Amino acid sequence: MAITAALVKELRERTGAGMMDCKKALQEVDGDMEAAIELMRKSGQAKAAKKAGRVAAEGVILVKSEGNQATLVELNCETDFVARDDSFLEFGDKVINAAFANKENDVEALKTTDIDGQTVEKTREDLVAKIGENMNVRRVQTLEAGDVVATYTHGARIGVAVALTGGDEDLARDLCMHVAASSPQFVKPEDVAAEVVEKERSIQVDIAMQSGKPKEIAEKMVEGRMRKFTGEISLTGQPFVKDPSMTVGELLKKAGADVVTFVRFEVGEGIERKEEDFASEVQAQVAAASKG
């Protein structure tokens, strides 16, 4: 029987599995839809796909470095319990090693990389079927720059890498800890993206205009607030966590060093977690019971 695009589409919709996996399953059972679903359930593919809709906002940040290269990977799961599971962590080790070896920056490319004779994605699907939780290789970034690269992890939930020119490993590690604690978004105030500056400036202009101050004073207020804003979200403009009497920029100048770039990953940042409304759930159950 010919395996049509419509058949593959239907199987994808019913299992949530990948297109190639669906096509392969249909070919193996000569186009029998129900047999293909059963085959995929037995192999764990349908089971893994069914769990793919769950929010995976827990997990670990994996970090590997050598010389002036560092690679970070975020590996997510649904619960903190699985984040400590040996099988999950063993999978994570294989993923970070593969990402580091390939100097990977593309998570989709990482998913197609071979580990132990099969792709990262297939290994993930097998592990989902085994453990019973959704998990996801969410992102990867490799930093290769500067004279000195240091890394820091905080409880496996935050991972940081910093690349310096000048300075030494102690300074680089101190800056890693600072980045972990203070979450800068840019290296220097002048690096702040134009759209970020424009959005904040429009807000500050509205606030200044509502103050009733003369135009020239309002303009100075806006400029002062913008300097403060760009300083607060940039690494060199922030007070150094180990000595707030100086900024990171002043610390770097004193050490004769510069930050080339940095990476900061935190588990689950930007993932919308599902909020469980237990009160509404109980009310619905009570209402249903009273009708019965």
From Swiss-Prot:
Question: What does the record give under GO molecular function?
Answer: translation elongation factor activity
- Location (main, coarse): cytoplasm
Name the domain of life.
Bacteria
Checking InterPro entries in the record gives: EF-Ts_dimer_sf, Transl_elong_EFTs/EF1B, Transl_elong_EFTs/EF1B_dimer, Transl_elong_Ts_CS, UBA-like_sf
TM spans, by residue? none
Query: Can you say where in the cell this protein is located?
Result: Cytoplasm
Q: Where does the record place the region Involved in Mg(2+) ion dislocation from EF-Tu?
A: 79-82
- Entry-linked Pfam families: EF_TS
Q: Which UniProt keywords apply?
A: Cytoplasm, Elongation factor, Protein biosynthesis
GO terms for CC? cytoplasm
Q: Which PANTHER family match?
A: ELONGATION FACTOR TS, ELONGATION FACTOR TS, MITOCHONDRIAL
Functional description taken from the UniProt entry: Associates with the EF-Tu.GDP complex and induces the exchange of GDP to GTP. It remains bound to the aminoacyl-tRNA.EF-Tu.GTP complex up to the GTP hydrolysis stage on the ribosome.
Family under the similarity heading: Belongs to the EF-Ts family.
Protein name, UniProt field: Elongation factor Ts
In which organism is this protein found?
Idiomarina loihiensis (strain ATCC BAA-735 / DSM 15497 / L2-TR)
